[in-house]
Amino acid sequence: MATAQLSHSIKIHKASKETVFPSQITNEHESLIMVKKLFATSISCITYLRGLFPESSYGERHLDDLSLKILREDKKCPGSLHIIKWIQGCFDALEKKYLHMAVLTLYTNPKEPEKVTEIYQFKFKYTKEGATMDFDSYSSSASFESGTNSEDIKKASILLIRKLYILMQNLGPLPNDVILTMKLHYYNAVTPHDYQPPGFKEGVNSHLLLFEGEPVNLQVGLVSTGFHSMKVKVTTEVTRVSDLENNLFQENSTTEIAHQGLDFDEEEEECNNHVRQSCSESPLIASVKKKRKKDFPIYFFYEFRK
């Protein structure tokens, strides 16, 4: 049942480029489908461009001028099945409106999982407000606001994916072997104490994550449908990031992760002093393939600039 759910959520008909995301978003159900697809596409992009799984673990889909690699079930690659199971668990928590944040972490030493190489944060909110998209950087900011206009939401989502693709190609190569884990953080007020989505178990309440060098926070973007919003943020060491034009992704502080850990808003911290977590049932070890490149136009970044 869960496998069918994932396949349905990211399935794309070859006859149309528009079916990567829903053609319209007029209600909460369509919004949920949109957020699921955006989340699954983002995870697929990360794992593909970081060379974590073989080509056979991905199918190719197209959205406008983007060629997307989407994770699919590959029985020859247990690691990809692991990731798909984690995505399914996130879908379950999203459907129930429990999921606050999903954190994908890459590290190298199984005895020191707190010493990380890369962190990918996906932060979710459930709202009734209009669609917004906001990007921050040292030197400039770009914002785009509207009501729940389906075309605008699609443009915002494509922009987020473009930024994620470019960021993945500007990160330094990973070590030959890395370990992946995923932790989920919930909204305590609505999440049952004993809730665990498929593929996850009770986690330890700790936000402490360490980098060997100076960390930098890279804001990829935030997309809101009017019913859901998803914010994407990447953290790694400064020395692993190269050639990011105009500091497009960077936050105002490169040391935030060292002091605050994960990306919780101040008001959320006050209400979630004892945030319950789930963690993936077992870490995933991946042998990194050669770093992949995907070529596509980058002009889209500047359409919303003022």
From Swiss-Prot:
InterPro entries: HORMA_dom (IPR003511), HORMA_dom_sf (IPR036570), HORMA_MeioticProgression (IPR051294). It comes from Canis lupus familiaris (Dog). It holds the Pfam family HORMA. One of its GO terms (cellular component) is nucleus. It is found in: Nucleus; Chromosome. Transmembrane segments: none annotated. Keywords: Chromosome, Meiosis, Nucleus, Phosphoprotein. Residues 29-234 form the HORMA domain. Phosphorylated in a SPO11-dependent manner. PANTHER family: HORMA DOMAIN-CONTAINING PROTEIN 1, HORMA DOMAIN-CONTAINING PROTEIN 2. This is HORMA domain-containing protein 2.
